[in-house]
Amino acid sequence: MTLESMMACCLSDEVKESKRINAEIEKQLRRDKRDARRELKLLLLGTGESGKSTFIKQMRIIHGSGYSEEDKKGFTKLVYQNIFTAMQSMIRAMETLKILYKYEQNKANAVLIREVDVEKVMTFEQPYVSAIKTLWNDPGIQECYDRRREYQLSDSAKYYLSDVDRIATPGYLPTQQDVLRVRVPTTGIIEYPFDLENIIFRMVDVGGQRSERRKWIHCFENVTSIMFLVALSEYDQVLVESDNENRMEESKALFRTIITYPWFQNSSVILFLNKKDLLEDKILYSHLVDYFPEFDGPQRDAQAAREFILKMFVDLNPDSDKIIYSHFTCATDTENIRFVFAAVKDTILQLNLKEYNLV
């Protein structure tokens, strides 16, 4: 064999190998594209206590295996701790707001509850049960509860404190609603994947408090949709981290930052205006115009208030071509979330199919 023919032979082998590698790469790219279409990443964003973790719990109930008896048992201690935390917050606020107890015995009850180390609470027994019940029924504590926007109190405080008898029964097992209302601040990142119509939806919940947000950065790749939660009821509340900053202003600032991030240029944005039930209660006595003077709608009108808040957020979008999809929600209401997420899923799938030129 001549040198030329040997070289030609080697060359054709190299070309073959190169073609094979190229074909492999093309195949892998097609597979990646198909797999990317099969797994959609949904990033749940919003400030602290906007309802992100509750939303994930609902996905587990609606699209996952829900909560077994064993799972619910795991929440018992957390329900007890939420009760003590709520009452301790109100006892501290009684002093700060200089509100007096109506019944003398409640001074001693307050001392008893205040000295409890919440982290160590594992049970809910006497004398704590009657102390908390008696305190909750004190007109002073009720006045303090009505002024809760002036300090930090969990949204589920009234839900649990009004049901102390049931929760204190021996062998108590938390209900699904008890589980949905448990407040545990999210630290770090929680992922919840679920399968829908042969597509994996990977929902990622990141902590909303300021200290948690710096951990978000690596979640930003390949995000199909941003699901941004706003608590409608926060228009008159201040931040956990800073008691002279309005929570809704903080939420607006975060939303503005998120929708202008270059990472999210190709991600759809879905805005959940959450806690609509709390807004309906609160709007009757706390006027939106006192916190947002530009509001010129009627007072005590939840519909006008929520439309104004929606417009405030949508107006932050600088890109007229980018549609912001919005829904009013109540994250603790399973049927409401089932209905809303069905619409959201259709939106996400349609947009995703468009991106892959499949429609």
Curated annotation (Swiss-Prot):
GO terms for cellular component: cytoplasm; heterotrimeric G-protein complex; plasma membrane. Its main location: membrane. It is a lipid-anchor. SMART domains: G_alpha. One of its GO terms (biological process) is phospholipase C-activating dopamine receptor signaling pathway. Mg(2+) binds at S53, T186. Keywords: Cell membrane, Cytoplasm, GTP-binding, Hydrolase, Lipoprotein, Magnesium, Membrane, Metal-binding, Nucleotide-binding, Palmitate, Transducer. Guanine nucleotide-binding proteins (G proteins) function as transducers downstream of G protein-coupled receptors (GPCRs) in numerous signaling cascades. The alpha chain contains the guanine nucleotide binding site and alternates between an active, GTP-bound state and an inactive, GDP-bound state. Signaling by an activated GPCR promotes GDP release and GTP binding. The alpha subunit has a low GTPase activity that converts bound GTP to GDP, thereby terminating the signal. Both GDP release and GTP hydrolysis are modulated by numerous regulatory proteins. G proteins are composed of 3 units; alpha, beta and gamma. The alpha chain contains the guanine nucleotide binding site. This is Guanine nucleotide-binding protein subunit alpha-11. It comes from Meleagris gallopavo. The lineage of its organism: Eukaryota, Metazoa, Chordata, Craniata, Vertebrata.
